[in-house]
Design a protein with these regions (language model features):
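Flavin-dependent oxidoreductase catalytic core characteristic
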Residues: 1-149
Length: 149
């Protein structure tokens, strides 16, 4: 955001350009999603370590889901952030170029999307993780979120 507020192109700040604002939102939304899911997963971990079986089952489905989504989105977010910064985002004096490289490594280290999908299926079939996820989502979402009366 600092770059968008301060960098001037064609006589206007980047943040004042409608297409740039749209791109910023496309950076911010998945970032906030990953942060929110990280907190939800951390809470499940705390409760699982305190002995909650439901939290342990929830943790089994949240962990691979978070790994998949956050590492996949990180590549796009970092690429868009580098683009937003322009050429200065590419040079090594700023973290953006390193973050982009690290984002690609994240999905490699955490396993391919197919392996992560198999882990989710294992959690559902063997550990009842879906039964733990459903009430968690119901508590977080409005009653009519899925068009039900």
């Amino acid at each position: 955001m600092t770059v968008a507020r301060n960098r001037v192109v064609f006589g206007r700040r980047i943040i004042d350009l409608p297409l740039a604002r749209r791109q910023l939102m496309k950076i911010m939304l998945p970032t906030e999603q990953a942060l929110s899911m990280s907190f939800l997963t951390a809470d499940a971990l705390d409760r699982a370590e305190a002995g909650s079986q439901d939290a342990a089952a929830l943790l089994r489905i949240l962990t691979p889901t978070l790994k998949f989504r956050a590492t996949r989105d990180a590549r796009k977010v970092c690429g868009d952030a580098l683009e937003m910064r322009g050429g200065i985002g590419y040079i090594e004096e700023f973290a953006t170029a390193r973050l982009l490289r690290d984002a690609h490594l994240g999905s490699i280290w955490e396993g391919t999307s197919n392996v992560v999908a198999l882990d989710v299926m294992r959690a559902i079939r063997r550990e009842g993780a879906l039964d733990a996820l459903e009430p968690t989502l119901e508590a977080m979402l409005p009653k009519d979120a899925f068009g039900e009366a």
